Curated annotation (Swiss-Prot):
Top-level taxonomic group: Bacteria
Organism: Staphylococcus epidermidis (strain ATCC 12228 / FDA PCI 1200)
UniProt keyword list: Cell membrane, Membrane, Protein transport, Translocation, Transmembrane, Transmembrane helix, Transport
Name by which UniProt lists this protein: Accessory Sec system protein translocase subunit SecY2
Family: Belongs to the SecY/SEC61-alpha family. SecY2 subfamily.
Assembly: Component of the accessory SecA2/SecY2 protein translocase complex required to export cell wall proteins. May form heterotrimers with SecE and SecG subunits.
Membrane topology: Multi-pass membrane protein
Annotated transmembrane regions: 14-34, 60-80, 102-122, 128-148, 152-172, 183-203, 237-257, 272-292, 335-355, 362-382
Main location: membrane
NCBIfam families: acc_sec_Y2 (TIGR02920), PRK12417.1 (NF009082)
GO biological process entries: intracellular protein transmembrane transport; protein targeting
UniProt function note: Part of the accessory SecA2/SecY2 system specifically required for export of possible cell wall proteins. The central subunit of a protein translocation channel.
InterPro entries: SecY/SEC61-alpha, SecY2, SecY_dom_sf
Name of the gene: secY2
A single Gene Ontology CC term: plasma membrane
Amino acid sequence: MFKKFEYKILYKRIFFTCLILVIYIIGSNISIVSNENLRTHKDSFFKLAITNVGGDLHTLNIFSLGLGPWLSSMIILTLINHKSNDKVKTQTRRERHFKERALTLIISAAQGFYIIHSYINKHAIKDSNMLILLLVLITGTLLMVWLADQNTTYGISGPMPIVLMSLVKSIFNTHFPKLNSSASLITMIIVLLVLALFILFFIELTEYRIEYNDIMNISAKDIPSYLSWKLNPAGSISIMVSLSLFMLTNNIVNFIGRFIVNHNFETHVFNFTNPVGITIYLLLQMILGYFLSRLLINTKRKSKEFLKNGNYFEGIQPGQQTEKFLGSKARRICWFGSIVVAIVLAIPMYSALLVPHLLKEVYFTTQMIVFVYIGINIAETIRAYLYFDSYKQILNKYW
């Protein structure tokens, strides 16, 4: 007898996510200044960075800043609260949200000021309506954060579908109509892209398993119990967060420089057009990827769970010895995953320096890597909903 499972919860979540994406598409097409003035303004680095966090600088619209300020505020607060977990646990959801939104407001104001000031310096827009434009950008950012927050609760994968849609829009608007390279060059780019995606698939779908003794599962001795970790637990969120922080650093340096040095000051250190900037970004990506992975694995909490449940590793004492054992394993796994992801991103970025006329194609490759990586994470989320929804008929008997 065939059983038909109705994935009603999943369908509702997909519908809600589609509704959020429709709102994002409409908002990203509402320009707040003339498009003709912005077509002459080209900043490939900034457009690439802001696209990967859900923003759009091809036109100055209400969602131009994207989710970068929000992602930056979350990682900053996470690093601040890392040593005081007890205080964080006592905070209410309203208190946490207030801190996130307040810091997001400050960061979005700084980034918005930098973007508008850059357009003014290059005579793309006039400075007479600067405060109004800044207010619109900040309001759009907070609205976008609210949409991502609602999608986390009622939709699928939180902010990731918004970033995915931003990448799709950027790829079609910027790259496809303008790829004029030779057939052999395009073939080489495709081969490198496939190789990079294969490595990312390997990292995402491969698990590192540590076998342990489960005292509650004595009847099934032939079936081993194991603790499984992904090779890169942080996933695509580390790329988005690292780009957001790198872009924030660039904005802060330029913001301070234009007040202290001169109003035309613009640093080229925190940029993808020089090896120093790329190296700084890759180091930031590795470090953030490592710490986010360690935060998600949380070996301290896992060792406490083992101590409470009575589970243990062969030859390892429960408690502190288990925590050290898991910490050493997690350290190797997290560094390996973050370094491999950084290497995959480094290849197209450094290639752009060696072959400058391929900058457009290289940025296209980078965006495709991020696009597929986010797509993998969304697919895993949908698979998880499919898995739990298949047990809905059984669970309904007890709930």
